Amino acid sequence: MVITMCCIVSFAAVAGPKIDTSPDRAKTALNPGLKQIGSLQPRRANEISGSNWTLGCETLDRDFADYQQYKEYIVPLGIKTIRLQGGWAKTEKVKGKYDFTWLDSIVDDACGRGLNIILETDYGNTNYVGGGGADLAGGFPTSGEALAAWDRWVEAMAAHYKGRVRDWAMWNEPDINKKHQPGDIAPFNIRTAEIIRRVIPDARIAGLSLSSSSPKLLNDCLKLLADQGKMDLFNWFIYHGYDFNPDISYQNVEELKVTLGKYSTQAKMRQGENGCPSEVATKFALSNYPWTESSQAKWDLRRMLGDLGHDVESAVFTICDFNHLGREINRKGLLWATADKQVEKIKLAYYAVQNCVAVFDDTLERVKEPVVGVVYDKSTASFAYRNKNSGRNLVVLWCNSGTPDDSFVTRPAQVVVKNLAIKEPVWVDLVSGRIYEIPADRIVKTGEFIIFKDVPLYDAPVLIAEKTLLLK
């Protein structure tokens, strides 16, 4: 029987550490030399109409994390869409028998909280000869028997979640298995997506799910899809592409968008997985670097707002640390977890992401013409946004010259905006969420320009914003 309505869930108290809702919940050493007048107010996911973000809730299919331990932290964060993985091996432990109970408990809980789900079709199943690998980098199913079994599982899963899950994604990071070439990836995407779309005609499907952000790899895969007339199966194409300095990725991102434009005017690129560790790691992306909670928070914000500024949907990887058995604990979570999956600490990045989500929702639109100029001793990124309802404006900017560090020391920047009215500007630090007054003697208005003198700037995003956008 297909369940078409989400269950109603009760919201229990958080079992782990309590979420701090005080104005100084995100504690840093920042001192910009300005008068603090307030703090950003977090917004729950059900208080936000829509936004650019997806939150990773991965690896539950392999029991590396426990949804029940972190579920109460999702809605207060403010992100409305979560990424889950389908788990063929966990669902079909006995050939021909599907037990979706484990996934139902997660999907129904998430739906009951008002969350949207993007469900990924992976990984393999060793019950079948040639059934592929059941973990990251495992190969696709290859034998005739295993491929037929894959098709049956995808169809059963799509039918089971029709009415509950509309958004779907293909097998995660097929390209990190070097046996998988475009000639393998594209046909496997086609067979999977065709089944989903037949069962759920209005499904929204993300193709490829590539680890790489290589324009050449994308082009090689898209050409095969286009040659088969299958581009219309897909609404998005996913890339990941980790970089120590998140800002250096955007030349590739723009090339990815141009590449996709050769084959489709409808589909869009989507960043499907990116995050930063909060401590030194020896395995996984961004390993062997002295990350801390401070640099993680900065990195996550720069990735989120860099993606938004380049008009790309963006994923935060991940809600909670997970114990990747046989490797090590992946510390990219916003929540710090023990080896036995218990949430022990809320990281600084949780509050930083919460601050970002509270400001940047779908009521803002990017002002695309060049309206911001920044004079600084290093390279910077900057973007301008306007509230579609009120017309009120803000600018976000940061130093993008290197990998985020642990320092909260700011240096002065001179910022010029053109044709962007900000009547009562405030300065906001997104890591801490603190809002500061900008002294009148640092603001010069001349014709269509506003000059902000000696704006505190460092390697994490800050705002110059209309006060009434943030403080009611």
Predicted regions and their residues:
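Aromatic/acidic polysaccharide-binding cleft in carbohydrate-active enzymes
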Residues: 276-360, 367-377
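Solvent-exposed beta-hairpin/edge-strand motifs
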Residues: 416-435
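Substrate-binding cleft and catalytic face of glycoside hydrolase catalytic domains
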Residues: 77-235, 241-244
